[in-house]
Amino acid sequence: MRAKRMVVGLLAAVATAFAGLTGSATAAPDHTDVDPLIVGGVNATQVYSFMVSLQNTSGGHFCGGSLIKSNWVVTAKHCVQGKTPASVRARIGTTNRTSGGSYVAAAAIHLNPTRDIALVRLAAAVPQAPIKVAAASGPVGTATRLLGWGQTCPSPGGCGAPVILQQLDTSIVADGLCSGIFGAQEICTNNPGGTRGACYGDSGGPEIKMVAGAWQLIGATSRSGGGSICAVKPSIYVDVPVFRPWISGIAGPV
């Protein structure tokens, strides 16, 4: 997966927490359908034009995503599996998931047949600048940043989702630190201090790295790398650059 290339709801079996965090998140109080959020992060220090909040028709956030073209969003498959385009809305390019940016309906959903990645085609192009998909995720030690509106406390359903986007600086770690990872197609990402990382509500959201002064997309939040309590273990992200051929075959070159 690179030189060593690095949820929306509880799964019935706690062991694979985060990884189905989209459809099951309805159990969380006060934020129906919310996926992992970032535990131990801080309020976003800038507006990320490409940041997407996937929402139901009532405006409830359930997953994150990344704008990769003016009318295409990449997210986790478990976020949109079983959903119809008519049931999905996207708020794009704001740090507040309830206001600002562009608010657009989904027109089509494409699920990858084997891994936890999906594409959402928007009903209309938006003016926000998309993020470039990186050439590769990078080796162990690559500095990255996570973004999301997921739960900010580690226990499932223990708190609501923040209104303001959260960010967390972290790094790629060895695949062996993530249980159940598909190393050639996924990224194992550190949980700094053993207490900070993605949580319920963050699923589908971006893992990004800085390249020549600009953010590039390397990952989409997928699941925990071990355990149902958020941030106590490294977490797993789909390696988006690996799926460039699949993405380009549907959305056009990226």
Predicted regions and their residues:
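Bacterial N-terminal signal peptides
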Residues: 11-20
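N-terminal activation segment of mature serine protease catalytic domains
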Residues: 29-56
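C-terminal subregion of chymotrypsin/trypsin-like serine protease catalytic domains
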Residues: 2-9, 23-30, 67-77, 167, ...
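A conserved glycine-rich beta-strand in the N-terminal activation segment of trypsin-fold
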Residues: 49-70, 101
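Chymotrypsin/trypsin-fold serine protease catalytic domain
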Residues: 100-107, 117, 121-195, 233, ...
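Conserved H-D interstitial segment of serine endopeptidase catalytic domains
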Residues: 54-55, 73-76, 81-112
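Acidic glycine-/aspartate-rich tracts in secreted/extracellular proteins
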Residues: 58, 78-82, 93-98, 123-127, ...
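Structural detector of coil-to-beta-strand junctions
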Residues: 49-53, 130, 187, 206
